[in-house]
From Swiss-Prot:
The gene is nuoK. Its EC number is 7.1.1.-. InterPro entries: NADH_UbQ_OxRdtase_chain4L/K (IPR001133), NUOK/Mnh_C1-like (IPR039428). The lineage of its organism: Bacteria, Pseudomonadati, Pseudomonadota, Betaproteobacteria, Rhodocyclales. GO terms for molecular function: NADH:ubiquinone reductase (non-electrogenic) activity; quinone binding. It comes from Dechloromonas aromatica (strain RCB). This is NADH-quinone oxidoreductase subunit K.
Length: 103
């Protein structure tokens, strides 16, 4: 029977974090892909917090994850609102076009 240790979760979190960093560096043009990569990065960090919290028998890591998820939800809502305004005005979702939204 396979038991999952802390190192398994940390390795998986590191892999997810690395995938999100690669996604950010390889695709700097598309705003939607950047938002998804940032969300994946936050979820990798959250998974590490929960893993440490579980193995150390401390609930503070899991409570901290709820705060991070709240901030991530607000960040996603604001990012998607900016994305919708950008697409309605310019018919494009490229990061380079964000400078043209100035008042």
């Amino acid at each position: 029977m396979l038991t999952l240790s802390l190192s398994h979760f940390l390795i998986l979190g590191a892999i997810l974090f690395a995938i999100s960093v690669v996604g950010i560096f390889l695709n700097r043009k598309n705003l939607l892909v950047l938002l998804m990569a940032i969300e994946l990065m936050l979820l990798a960090v959250n998974m590490n917090f929960v893993a440490f919290s579980h193995y150390l028998q401390d609930l503070s890591g899991q409570i901290f994850v709820f705060f991070i998820l709240t901030v991530a939800a607000a960040e996603s809502a604001i990012g998607l609102a900016i994305l919708i305004v950008l697409f309605r005005n310019l018919k494009s979702i490229h990061v380079d076009d964000l400078g043209s939204l100035k008042g």
